[in-house]
Amino acid sequence: MFVDRVIIELIAGKGGNGVVAWRREKYIPKGGPAGGNGGRGGSVILEADTQISSLDWFRHRRILKAQSGGDGGGNCRQGKNGTDLILKVPCGTLLKDAKSGKVIHDFVEDKERFVLCKGGRGGRGNDSFKTPTHQAPNICTEGTLGEIHHIELELKLIADVGLVGFPNAGKSTLISSLAGLRVKVAAYPFTTLQPNLGFIELDNYKRIYIADIPGIIEGASHNRGLGLEFLRHIERTKLLIFILDASGIDGRTPSHDFRILREEIGAYNPELLERPYLVVLNKIDTEDSPSHIQEFEKNFSISSDMLFKISAVYGEGLQELIEKMTQRLSQKKEIEY
C-alpha cells in the first residue's frame, strides 16, 4: 500500500541512572565511592533511502522509542549507552512539526541523516561527586529524559517528469509503455489511486524518472476527487507533461481539459505554471481524434516542438516524445525544492 502522509510520536531514550556504590576490597575498610555514571539514551535519527518509495512502514507504528541507557554499576562501571533508533524514509520526505506544520527538515539526498530527538544524559554516580574536601559523597543523580517530538512525515515524490491529466487520459498506459511498469489500466475514472514512479533507461546509463499521479478533475485544487492528496507530488518535478485525451471521451475535448488542468494547477501552486512543459495528445488512433486535434491547435498556439500526437496503446510517437523529454531535461537547471 502506498502511504504518503503519517503522524507519529518519536521518543529518544532516557539516560541511565547514576548509582551510589563503595569500594569493597580486603584490607581497605574505607575504600571510598565507586558508583558509576549512567549511559546515554539512544537518539532518534531519520535517514533518507532511495530504496524506499512509501511511508507504509509507519502506518501502524504511531509511537516509536529509542533504547534507554543502562544504569551505572559498582567499581565505577558506566552504564551501557542506548542504541540509536534509525528510521528510513523515502527521498522527498518532508519532516514537519505535527502541531504547527513547520518544516523541520527536507530529505532530498540518499543517506542524508537528521538527528531529531537527542537521547537523555546519563546520571552521575557518587564517584563523580568526590572532591578533595568531600571524600565520601553519598549522592547520585538520575538520567534525564530523552527528547520527544510529535511529527508529521509527508512524502513528495522526486521525479524528473510529472504526468498530468484527467482520469482516462491514458497516463497509466503511457507510463507503462515508456517505463515498462505493470500498472492497473482500465476504462473507468480513478484507475490510478496512488502515484506511480517509473523510469526510462537511456543509452548513456542515465535514467529519466516519471511520476504518474491520479487523474485531476475540475475542483481538484479545492480537494475534489483525489485533490490535494496527490497534487503535491508534481511540485518537485522538473518537467510537466500534460496528457490530453484526443478521443473526446465523456463529451470533453482536449481544449477543455487543457484549460481546466492549467487552472487547477495554477490555483494549487502558481509557480508550477512557470515549469517547463510538453503537451501530449493521446489516442490519435480513435475515430474522432482528428477533429479534436484540429480544434485544439486552433485554440492554443503551442509550438510544434512542445506538442506531440501519440497513441500510447500502439507506441506511435513515443520515441520522439522520449527524445524531446531528454533534450528539455538536459537544458533545465536543477530546480531548488
UniProtKB/Swiss-Prot annotation:
SUPFAM superfamilies: Obg GTP-binding protein N-terminal domain (SSF82051), P-loop containing nucleoside triphosphate hydrolases (SSF52540). It comes from the Bacteria. Gene3D superfamilies: GTP1/OBG domain (2.70.210.12), P-loop containing nucleotide triphosphate hydrolases (3.40.50.300). The keyword Zinc does not apply. Its cofactor is Mg(2+). GTP binds at residues 165-172, 190-194, 212-215, 282-285, 311-313. GO terms for biological process: ribosome biogenesis. InterPro entries: G_OBG, GTP-bd, GTP-bd_Obg/CgtA, GTP1_OBG_dom, GTP1_OBG_dom_sf, OBG_GTPase, P-loop_NTPase, Small_GTP-bd. Keywords: Cytoplasm, GTP-binding, Hydrolase, Magnesium, Metal-binding, Nucleotide-binding. Its EC number is 3.6.5.-. Residues 159-330 form the OBG-type G domain. It is found in: Cytoplasm. Residues 1-158 form the Obg domain. Its main location: cytoplasm. The keyword Metal-binding applies. One of its GO terms (molecular function) is magnesium ion binding. Mg(2+) binds at S172, T192. Transmembrane segments: none annotated. Monomer. Belongs to the TRAFAC class OBG-HflX-like GTPase superfamily. OBG GTPase family. An essential GTPase which binds GTP, GDP and possibly (p)ppGpp with moderate affinity, with high nucleotide exchange rates and a fairly low GTP hydrolysis rate. Plays a role in control of the cell cycle, stress response, ribosome biogenesis and in those bacteria that undergo differentiation, in morphogenesis control. This is GTPase Obg.
